[in-house]
């Protein structure tokens, strides 16, 4: 099945993440702490923690930092205690936006998120106002030129639900969130290393943005992404590359 062009957007996302590595590490440390607190410090029995640790190593985080975050999560080291809060809202033209945060001060966080929306042409919604427009999935993205038939066979054997070939030749593999670690391991064992592998909120349909509207929408997304308490920002806005 065909899909939208993804490759340029993914490369942009990876480059932006690399440029903000310090912020990426801060977000990953929070994720490790919360995952360890909720599911324990053993990565073999805690899939969420295992995924967070893998992301940390992919971002070149030192092992000592990872271990400290795990210990802080299970209570072995003093530190701030974070809670997860999701906010939903609308951007330019009613585009749907989900903002996942981890915070030790929800009053501060909601004020900052609301300000970012209102200052950049958007507005906060209520719980559930836009999340129904997204699917919670495991997503793998492979570069154009990846052998499609072999990847599809390996993905479906691993338990993937869908394999999507995009207009630019990149290939997406989608799976249930709980199966993400299993599918990731199986694909890697078959010789397929994804350029992007994550559990995400994937929009069911996308709204195309071009020109000035694209600039305004990107400004809103950047403002949200740059907030210290924000972990992830999801949107159904497809912003055209310049």
Curated annotation (Swiss-Prot):
Per the UniProt record, the source organism is: Paraburkholderia xenovorans (strain LB400)
Primary location: cytoplasm
What SUPFAM superfamilies does its record include? YebC-like
Q: Which UniProt keywords apply?
A: Cytoplasm, DNA-binding, Transcription, Transcription regulation
For this chain's UniProt record, which GO biological process terms are given?
regulation of DNA-templated transcription
Organism superkingdom: Bacteria
User: Which Pfam families does this entry report, sorted A to Z?
Assistant: TACO1_YebC_N, Transcrip_reg
User: Where, subcellularly, is it found?
Assistant: Cytoplasm
Q: Which InterPro entries match?
A: Integrase-like_N, TACO1_YebC-like_2nd/3rd_dom, TACO1_YebC_N, Transcrip_reg_TACO1-like, Transcrip_reg_TACO1-like_dom3, YebC-like
Cross-referenced HAMAP family: Transcrip_reg_TACO1
**Cellular component GO terms, alphabetically?**
cytosol
Query: Could you tell me one molecular function GO term of this UniProt entry?
Result: DNA binding
Q: Does the keyword Lipoprotein apply?
A: no
Q: What is this protein called?
A: Probable transcriptional regulatory protein Bxeno_A1185
- Which family, according to UniProt? Belongs to the TACO1 family.
């Amino acid at each position: 099945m065909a899909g939208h062009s993804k490759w340029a957007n993914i490369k942009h996302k990876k480059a932006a993440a690399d440029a903000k590595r310090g912020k990426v590490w801060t977000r990953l440390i929070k994720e490790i702490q919360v995952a360890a607190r909720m599911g324990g410090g053993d990565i073999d029995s805690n899939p969420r923690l295992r995924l967070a640790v893998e992301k940390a190593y992919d971002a070149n985080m030192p092992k000592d930092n990872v271990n400290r975050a795990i210990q802080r999560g299970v209570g072995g080291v003093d530190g701030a205690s974070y809670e997860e809060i999701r906010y939903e809202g609308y951007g330019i033209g009613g585009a749907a936006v989900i903002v996942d945060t981890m915070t030790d001060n929800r009053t501060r966080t909601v004020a900052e998120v609301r300000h970012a929306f209102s200052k950049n042409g958007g507005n906060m919604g209520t719980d559930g106002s836009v999340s129904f427009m997204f699917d919670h999935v495991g997503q793998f993205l492979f570069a154009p030129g990846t052998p499609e038939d072999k990847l599809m066979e390996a993905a479906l054997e691993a338990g993937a639900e869908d394999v999507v070939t995009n207009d630019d030749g990149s290939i997406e593999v989608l799976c249930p969130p709980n199966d993400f670690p299993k599918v990731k391991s199986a694909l890697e064992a078959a010789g397929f290393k994804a350029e992007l592998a994550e559990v995400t909120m994937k929009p069911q349909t996308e709204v195309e943005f071009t020109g000035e509207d694209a600039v305004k929408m990107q400004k809103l997304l950047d403002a949200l992404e740059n907030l210290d308490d924000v972990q992830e920002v999801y949107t159904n806005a497809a912003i055209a590359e310049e």
